[in-house]
Amino acid sequence: MKIHVVVLSALVSWAPFVVAQEPAAAPDQESVQNVGPVRVFLDCRTRCDFDFIRQEIPYVAWVRDRQDAQVHLLITRQQTGAGGRENTLAFIGLQDMASVSDTLLQVSSPTDTDSEEREKLTRTIALGLIPYVARTPQAAGLDVSWTEPTEFELEAVEESDPWNSWIFRLRTSGSLGGEERTKDYSISTSVSANRTTEDVKTEIWTYGRYAESSFELSDGSTTTGLRRDYGASLLQVWSLGDHWSIGGETSAGHSLYGNYDLRAWIAPALEFSVWPYIEATRRQLTFLYALGVQHSDYIEMTIFGETQETRPAHSLFAGLSMNEPWGNATVGLEAFQYLHDPERHRLELFGRMNVRLFRGLDFNVSGHFARVKDQINLRAGEATDEEILLRQRELGTDFRYGFSFGLSYRFGSIFNNAVNPRFEALD
C-alpha cells in the first residue's frame, strides 16, 4: 500500500499555514540508511489526538520514551490574535538522525472544528517527518504531491479584512442542580473584543456572575450562600522591539465576596523579555513593572474604618517558562505594595515542573506560597460560622499555600503504534 502525503497550498486561507523557521539539514552522503521505520517520540504539550495521529501516519514507529527515539517531536501552542491556535512543531533529531532538525508552524482558524484542527496538525506532522522517512526503506512507499489552489481560493486570500483584525466573543452559561435538601444555580456571561497584531494588542473584557446555593439544616432552617461579581477591563500593549513592550491596564468591578461595591484600578506598565518574544513557545523570561492608583468603595466598613479610599500602588512580576526535551517548567514571582503604607504588601511565588528523570520515570511538582499583608478591604467584625463555611466573605490571613507532586514509571514494550478503541467506556 502506498502512503500519500498531500501538501495543500499555503495560499488556501482555511488550510494550515506552515512556515519552516529553521531549514532542515540536507541529507549527507555519510548518512546511514535505517533498516526499519523511523522511531518517533511524540511529546505534545497541548491538545493532540494521539490515536488519530498514529492511524494516519503508520509508516513510522511511535515509541513511548525519548531514549528509544530517533526523532523527538515537541509540540507547543499559543493563541493567535484572531482567536485561533498556532502550534510550534520542533523536530529534534536523535541518535543517527541527530544532524536533522527542523521547526514548523501550523496555524488553525478560530472557526475550525476539532476534526479540522487535528487533520491540519497531523498533516503538518507528516510534512515534518519526510526528511527522516526519506532516509529509511519506508521512503520507497512514500509519494509527495501538491494540490494547486483554485481561482476562488486565491481570491479569498487576497480579500481585505473588513473587521480590521478585531475579534468579538459573546459567552453565557448557566447551571442548575440539587437534591432533597440542597439546591444551587448559577449564571455567568462575558463579552470581549480583542485586536492583536505584531505591534499592538488590545483586549476589552466585561463579565458578570451570579451564584446561589441553599441548604436545609437539621433544625428545619435554611442557609443560603450568595456570590455576585461583575466588571470590565481594558488592556493596551505596544511593541518596542524584540525585547520591550509598553502599555497599561484599567479595570473596574464589583465583588460581594471581596467587600467591593466598586473597585477601580489604572496602571501604566513596562515589560522586558530576556529572550526575543518570538521564542515564547519554547522559552520566556520576562519582567513587568506597573505603577498605578486604586480607588475602592466598600460595601461595609473595613477593619481600618474606611468606607472608601484611593491609594497608589505598584507591582513587579518576574516569570520564567520553558518547554524543552527534558520537560517543562514555569516559575513566577509577584510583588504588590501600597505606597501609602509599605507594610501593606503581598509577595507570591508559584511554579510547576514536569521532568523526565530517566527512561520511563516522570516527575511532576507544583506549588505556590504567598505572604499576604495587603487586605485593606476586609470587613470589620467577626465572620459567622455560616460565612466561613459558605465562603461568603474574604477572611484575614497572613499566608496562602498549596503543594502537589506526582511520580509515574512506565516499562515494557517501547512501541506504541496500535490503536484499539473497544470498551473505552470501561477503560
What are these regions (language model features)?
Residues 366, 396-427:
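Outer-membrane beta-barrel "beta-signal"
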Residues 158-165, 198-201, 239-243, 258, ...:
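Short loop/turn motifs that connect adjacent beta-strands in outer-membrane beta-barrel proteins
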Residues 166-170, 202-204, 246-250, 266, ...:
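Transmembrane beta-strands of outer-membrane beta-barrel proteins
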Residues 170-172, 189-195, 234-238, 268-274, ...:
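Residues on the lipid-exposed face of transmembrane beta-strands in outer-membrane beta-barrel proteins
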Residues 164-166, 183-187, 226-230, 262-266, ...:
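Residues that define the transmembrane beta-barrel architecture of outer-membrane proteins
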Residues 35-40, 158-178, 199-204, 285-293:
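Transmembrane beta-strand segments of Gram-negative outer membrane beta-barrel proteins
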Residues 181-186, 215-221, 259-266, 297-305, ...:
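Outer-membrane beta-barrel translocator domains and adjoining extracellular loop/strand segments
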Residues 174-178, 197-199, 208-214, 250-256, ...:
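Transmembrane beta-strands of outer-membrane beta-barrel pores
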